[in-house]
Amino acid sequence: GFPGKSLIF
C-alpha cells in the first residue's frame, strides 16, 4: 500500500 507501509509495498 502507498502511502502507508513502505515505498515498495
From Swiss-Prot:
GO terms for molecular function: carbohydrate binding. It is found in: Secreted. Residues 1-9 form the Pentraxin (PTX) domain. It comes from the Eukaryota. Keywords: Amyloid, Lectin, Secreted. Transmembrane segments: none annotated. GO terms for cellular component: extracellular region. Its main location: secreted. The keyword Secreted applies. It is linked to SAP is a precursor of amyloid component P which is found in basement membrane and associated with amyloid deposits. Homopentamer. Pentraxin (or pentaxin) have a discoid arrangement of 5 non-covalently bound subunits. Belongs to the pentraxin family. This is Serum amyloid P-component. It comes from Mustelus canis (Smooth dogfish).
